Amino acid sequence: MKLRIAWIGRTRSPPIQSLTAEYLKRLSRYAACEALELMSEATLLRLLEKSTARTPPVLVLLDSRGLQLTSEEIANFLDYHQSHGTQELLFAVGPADGWSADTRAAANQVLSFGKITLPHELARVVLLEQLYRGFTILKGHPYHGGH
């Protein structure tokens, strides 16, 4: 299964760039992964339309109005998609003004990190860390020590 993590806009903060690179490296032990810096929400929709894969990617949006999952539930989500043959999970952190109705309608799942508002660059790192944590839970790695 391939993971693609997309976000709108460039990452300008060196510490965020460093954390992003570190978690992408860690994730690559468990799945092929790729980060995508997109210029706009429209670019994400075009990316979905142009997909040439046998099956389209499963689009998971991050949005404050989405479903809140525990780390264990994220692990179960990843496990479900691995065991059911999902070829690609495409996670997307939205633009500052939120996702449009069209993009929300195109999504297979909308997730949230809670009712708090995070800077978009920080939300990217939290997403990458939670995906990594999810895989370590599945593999019984000591990174996730419980609560």
Q: Where are the predicted features?
A:
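Post-transcriptional modification and biogenesis factors for structured RNAs
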Residues: M1-H147
